[in-house]
Amino acid sequence: MALALRRLSSSVKKPISLLSSNGGSLRFMSSLSTAAMAESEKSRSSWIKQLNASLDEIDPEVADIIELEKARQWKGFELIPSENFTSLSVMQAVGSVMTNKYSEGYPGARYYGGNEYIDMAETLCQKRALEAFQLDPSKWGVNVQSLSGSPANFQVYTALLKPHERIMALDLPHGGHLSHGYQTDTKKISAVSIFFETMPYRLDENTGYIDYDQLEKSAVLFRPKLIVAGASAYARLYDYARIRKVCNKQKAVMLADMAHISGLVAAGVIPSPFEYADVVTTTTHKSLRGPRGAMIFFRKGLKEINKQGKEVMYDYEDRINQAVFPGLQGGPHNHTITGLAVALKQARTPEYKAYQDQVLRNCSKFAETLLAKGYDLVSGGTDNHLVLVNLKNKGIDGSRVEKVLELVHIAANKNTVPGDVSAMVPGGIRMGTPALTSRGFIEEDFAKVAEYFDLAVKIALKIKAESQGTKLKDFVATMQSNEKLQSEMSKLREMVEEYAKQFPTIGFEKETMRYKE
């Protein structure tokens, strides 16, 4: 490099004159410079104008898609238990200037300058997270940078386990989640099962409850380093104390994944996992009703006094923080963290407690009405925000019913139930009460929702009976071509929409909507 620089310098004999001493040339350059400056100023004003223009003006196509989604949310039944309607104040924070800042690192230790207010927002979010779940900050810490629930779980695994160490979690067809390490006999579906060895525990298929006795026996043989207590389609409460005992025997970490139920836990209407777990993860957009993000809570401080009488401290904090950044993420989403801080403040209010109480009452009434109509619920009922309907006794599956539900403006999702062999054509439908409760639905409304669901299932059975083949595509073809059945679906859709339109919108006003019919 030095030789190259010497050659370059020796080749330059004298300075190059950019301007002639000729006066005419100077006047020409001066006028050119003035013209260029004027053009630059004009260009600058154009992009600033563009940056400050509204969405309707800049991109009417995207604006129209958003308006269509508003109409869908207003006119339909949102029954997917992992969904909710977040508040206007949260959306204002998420759509704020906090999205503009890069802030790799943690408060007080960033790799970028200009983060004094980002630090304030993240620190406030952490403080409110601990307060929302009534945690002692000397015994618990929290990372609020994780982007979503699945990454949060993977970050915990990579922080606390070595590659190919062992994880036990609830089996996906029995109500578990992909991020807990799902695999089939022939394929590792989740990346977790690629990098770690995973083994499921399951429900007792006779009762629909987790088989804790078998879990304990399996743990003795498998010797897991971490056991997950958490689910995505389990309608009953976890026995955290029982899993804690199993973890103690195996010297395993207990990870509670409360993604679905964290809002209920924050409100104190169901038992908290924090008394028993070492680490707790949650998404923030389900029952918690915040923006789309995640949190990782971890124990810190004194763990135990060992046999030598020495204090042993928890070491989760540094390991988890390093797994999040720089291990698996770069810059955090500061707009999401700011919106989460707002949601966590709401979680400490009397209104929030009343809302979560109503979520449980609504789900209980929903389950009661479905049972009265002859539906089979996995575990026979519910203790939380969701019901899992096993449709096998009705002679139909979740995929076919889901297709009809969508056409009549009821959003629910097909779901595996114990005994299923296909995740694409499962035997169940999963439904929950958080979203519609946010819109003001109470018990009598969910009794009505159950009636509309029952009508949709009956239509699905008629379509199945008229289908020429046994495949899902044959069902869809009949659904799209049979005019009589289409008329029935149209009538049911009108009934659903008229009922749903009575209730308030969340996050936007009806008067501002483009599509009101």
UniProtKB/Swiss-Prot annotation:
Binding partners and assembly: Homotetramer.
Lineage: Eukaryota, Viridiplantae, Streptophyta, Embryophyta, Tracheophyta
Keywords: Mitochondrion, One-carbon metabolism, Pyridoxal phosphate, Transferase, Transit peptide
Binding site for methotrexate: E104, T184, D185, T186, K414
Top EC category: transferase
Modified residues (N6-(pyridoxal phosphate)lysine): K286
EC number: 2.1.2.1
Record-linked InterPro entries: PyrdxlP-dep_Trfase, PyrdxlP-dep_Trfase_major, PyrdxlP-dep_Trfase_small, Ser_HO-MeTrfase, Ser_HO-MeTrfase-like, Ser_HO-MeTrfase_PLP_BS, SHMT-like_dom
One of the protein's GO biological processes: L-serine metabolic process
Activity control summary: Inhibited by the antifolate drugs methotrexate and pemetrexed.
Family: Belongs to the SHMT family.
Chain's role: Functions outside the photorespiratory pathway in catalyzing the interconversion of serine and glycine with the conversion of tetrahydrofolate (THF) into 5,10-methylene-THF.
Binding of pemetrexed, residues: S82, Y102, E104, Y112, S148, G149, S150, H177, S232, H260, G331, R430
Record-annotated disulphide pairs: none
Cofactor: pyridoxal 5'-phosphate
Reactions that this protein is recorded to catalyse: (6R)-5,10-methylene-5,6,7,8-tetrahydrofolate + glycine + H2O = (6S)-5,6,7,8-tetrahydrofolate + L-serine
Disruption phenotype: Does not display a lethal photorespiratory phenotype when grown at ambient carbon dioxide.
Database matches in Gene3D superfamilies: Aspartate Aminotransferase, domain 1 (3.90.1150.10), Type I PLP-dependent aspartate aminotransferase-like (Major domain) (3.40.640.10)
Source organism per UniProt: Arabidopsis thaliana (Mouse-ear cress)
Transit peptide boundaries: 1-29
Tissue/organ expression: Ubiquitous. Mainly expressed in the shoot apical meristem and roots. Also detected in the leaf vasculature, especially in the protoxylem and adjacent cell layers.
PROSITE patterns, per database record: SHMT
Name of this chain's protein: Serine hydroxymethyltransferase 2, mitochondrial
Pathway(s) it belongs to: One-carbon metabolism; tetrahydrofolate interconversion
